[in-house]
Regions:
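The feature marks non-catalytic terminal segments
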Residues: 1-2, 54-56, 74, 78-82, ...
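Active-site rim/loop-helix segments in enzyme catalytic domains that contact anionic ligands
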Residues: 1-116, 146, 230
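Alpha-helical elements of Rossmann-like donor-binding domains used by nucleotide-donor carbohydrate transfer enzymes
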Residues: 19-23, 74-77, 104, 108, ...
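Residue-level detector of flexible, active-site-proximal loop/helix-junction positions
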Residues: 38-40, 94-96, 128, 162-164, ...
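Short, well-ordered secondary-structure micro-motifs
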Residues: 44-46, 99-101, 133-134, 166-169, ...
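Short, well-ordered beta-to-alpha junction loops that form the rim of enzyme active sites
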Residues: 91-93, 123-126, 159-160
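Active-site adenylate/phosphate-handling loop in enzymes that bind or generate adenylated species
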Residues: 106-154
């Protein structure tokens, strides 16, 4: 089975569903991760297209380009830890995806779906403080609209700690819980591959917080550790 994970930034895939990804690959499913935005915070002029439009001198631009290269290396390392070898980067501007037309973002996702033919698509929750996450949810829902020739049977959204929980007043309401007790340490190891993204507790992107979140969802679902998801669409040929 082909599983497509569409995220805005490098590390979102680990924070949201690193344990579940590992569970899929352990069970011999194929997982593809698509990173839509750069993950390098945008201090750029409007209508950003590439590094030349940064409002910085050449040295600073070069440093940011090197940082982006390092971030992509970290992403591939994290993916490998989770058992994933297929990672694609789209390089949309970070925290500015609302400046890109929904059609352009949707078409990028549609092309990936056309070639990869996933059975399940995961993406961000609609209820998220990060604008890139919200844009991606909308684009993914459009790209996965059910048609007779579409391979997708399920569309599922996930939370990203340090982003989803800060959205108000509507909130992420999970109805799927995946047991990651055996995969939690792998998730932590994959997160630590992002050497510049880890924070100290009590930040939600700290190692301790990731453990707490997994344990918390476990208490909700009768498990020792879990990742939480919200089912967006489930097309089934058999009765529930």
């Amino acid at each position: 089975m082909n599983i497509l994970v569409i995220v805005a930034h490098p590390d979102d895939e680990v924070l949201g569903m690193g344990g579940t990804i590992k569970k899929y690959t352990k069970n011999k499913h194929d997982v593809k991760i698509v990173i839509m935005a750069t993950g390098i915070f945008a201090r750029r002029s409007q209508n950003y297209q590439n590094s030349t439009s940064y409002k910085f001198d050449k040295k600073t631009i070069k440093n940011m380009e090197m940082e982006l290269v390092d971030l992509k290396k970290d992403c591939k390392k994290a993916a490998k830890i989770m058992g994933v070898t297929d990672v694609e980067f789209m390089d949309f501007p970070d925290n500015e995806m609302d400046t890109i037309s929904n059609l352009e973002v949707t078409k990028k996702i549609e092309l990936v779906i056309e070639h990869y033919k996933p059975s399940i698509v995961f993406t961000h929750s609609k209820y998220d403080v990060n604008v890139d996450h919200r844009v991606l949810y909308d684009a993914t829902i459009t790209a996965t609209r059910p048609t007779s020739n579409l391979s997708i049977k399920k569309v599922i959204s996930f939370e990203v700690p340090s982003s989803t929980e800060w959205y108000f007043p509507s909130q992420f309401s999970p109805n799927i819980f995946v047991d990651i007790n055996k995969e939690l340490e792998t998730k932590i190891k994959a997160l630590m591959a992002y050497k510049n993204e880890i924070r100290d507790f009590p930040h939600p992107r700290s190692v301790d917080a990731i453990r707490v979140i997994a344990k918390r969802w476990g208490t909700v679902s009768g498990l020792h550790a879990a990742e939480a998801f919200s089912l967006v669409r489930d097309i089934n040929n058999s009765v529930p």
